[in-house]
Design a protein with these regions (language model features):
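Alpha-helical scaffolding within the catalytic cores
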Residues: 14-21, 50-53, 143-147
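Aromatic-Pro/Gly-enriched surface loop or interdomain linker
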Residues: 1-29
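Extracellular/periplasmic catalytic domains that process cell-envelope and extracellular macromolecules
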Residues: 23-25, 59-60, 152-153
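Structural motif
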Residues: 28-35, 66, 158-160
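Catalytic beta-strand/loop cores that center a nucleophilic Ser/Cys/Thr
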Residues: 92-172
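A glycine-rich, often tryptophan-bearing local segment used as a flexible ligand/cofactor-contacting loop or short
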Residues: 37-119, 170
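A structural signal for short, well-ordered beta-strand segments and their strand-loop junctions
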Residues: 11-13, 66-69, 160-161
Length: 174
């Protein structure tokens, strides 16, 4: 989706972050895209506290994080989405069924949706069973499943997108 867009794109591996966490200081936004427990989103690498704290610290200090699908998806220490704190969302895997989930108000007037017709987005297949954590702005939800959310984390911001097939509108969302 970024091909041809006016952005400098740099691919950073988890190994790059492990060797030198300051590699994140040279970028503005991190994007983590894919299904959980895959090489794309990291899988077991999120069990490494150096990786986890470097990424979360980057966002907390003012960086941006865009997560698509199941970003940081790996069941560990009571969480499935290891980037839940900065993104403000979590996947219901059966461990939080007894938690009250009252945060379902949509904020379709959010600036992220300003260029979208009818303030809507095509999420393709998207992901199921994603819920918002306290303090997260749900921009779009469908049947009590978060499709698009924004969450301030320290001085930075996380944005969760359930799916992002290529289109002009989705390019604008990014």
């Amino acid at each position: 989706a970024l091909s041809g867009a006016p952005f400098d794109v740099k691919f950073i591996s988890f190994d790059d972050i492990k060797v030198d966490p300051k590699v994140l200081d040279s970028i503005d936004v991190l994007i983590n895209v894919g299904d959980g427990d895959t090489a794309h989103t990291g899988g077991k690498v999120w069990e490494d506290p150096e990786i986890s704290s470097a990424v979360k610290g980057f966002v907390h200090r003012g960086g941006g994080l865009i997560g698509v699908g199941e970003p940081g998806g790996h069941q560990y220490q009571g969480r499935y989405l290891q980037l839940a704190a900065p993104l403000g969302v979590e996947k219901e895997t059966g461990f939080a069924l007894n938690y009250d989930k009252y945060n379902w108000d949509e904020h379709r007037d959010h600036f992220i949706l300003a260029d979208c017709p009818d303030h809507d987005v095509d999420f393709g297949e998207g992901k199921k069973n994603i819920f918002a954590l306290e303090g997260t702005e749900i921009l779009i939800q469908r049947d009590k499943e978060v499709q698009l959310a924004a969450h301030e984390y320290g001085q930075g911001r996380g944005v969760y997108i359930s799916g992002l097939p290529y289109s002009f509108v989705n390019n604008r969302v990014l």
